Amino acid sequence: MRKSQKLAFRKGQFRITDITGVSLRGEIIKQIIKPTIHAVFDVAVEEMDHDVDDIEILFITREEEEERRREDPDLYRLDAWDREVLKKTSMDEHNYKSPINCIYEYDYDVLQPVANFEEFFEIDFDHVPLWKVDIYGDFAFYGSDPYIKETKEYPEEYISDEKRSEVELDYLLYNSTKLEQHRQYIIKNKEHFTDVKPQILETGERAEHLLMKRFYYNKIDNVIERKQEIEEDPIYTYIKFDFGAKLDLRIARLYYLNFTRMERMDLENQQKLYEFEKAALKGIAFDNFMILFGVFLIWATHPYLYKKIPWRIRYFFEFHRDEVIEYILMIPQIPKITWEEIKAYWTGQVMFTVIPTFQYAWSFLGKKIDLETIQAWKILAKTLNDIY
């Protein structure tokens, strides 16, 4: 019924008359119908036939609501475990049955109650701090925590050990009694539960978590000493309690994943180190080449240092100056390129950095080289050798 109401509300077909037959809290009705309080009041007066109880529940406060619970508990029939369930059972199953006559709806591998979460678990959504949310992303059963009830929030600084122990004892007592009440409620209403769908709070890890919490917080009897009694507990007819084996599997899986992760990290680090060494060696070689090339250029162009060049080399360039100029002018004609192409290359958009320039020049010359060019270069080299 709750699901059909939400779908109708999303489609815009929702009316307040659709929920007048269900006992809901005021905040929930305000949450479903979004307009202002005055608009809610006008619509309620028009469509609820001036029922005082239905109009009053829209604007009731929490204090008035608690007082109303004590005076007229039949208005709040979902409080099964807040009453003395060990003495009398609830008669309100029809309130949260689904259209297929099941107490819970099965969706996404989790058994979810048809009733609203807040009213089913009695949790105050406005005053539950983040640290009170358990590891499964759910609100743990902290609704009646006395410390939360007094302060409405948990202080950021640490409380004293004495105060904290009082809060912890109250919390342990509250949880143990709550789970025991719920277990008794399940046992006394066995006809509403089937073996196909174990109808408890939830299945899987969440149910194991609740059971572990129940046995852990029952400090009077030790779990290990009560092993035989625990295995024969009636609640095992509704829950498969094998979290120990699953925990071992999870630990083994964690070790395996950690081992593979470390192995993969070692391989990646080794590859990165190899790439770094290769790049460093290439960079060092290129730097040395550029340093030597720069020293040669400075040496060849400086007037004083030029005189320090060995006399045979200097004499060759001075005595055969015309031949050297002629051969320099002849070099572009050997690979069959013109001075215009060289000028366009050096002044064009190609030269951005040194390395791409050398790469482009080498590829450009490599495309032009043929057998005749190689023969011409050999003749040029032989001629230069003869001149020297």
From Swiss-Prot:
Its main location: mitochondrion. It is found in: Mitochondrion. Keywords: Mitochondrion. One of its GO terms (cellular component) is mitochondrion. This is Uncharacterized mitochondrial protein Mp05.
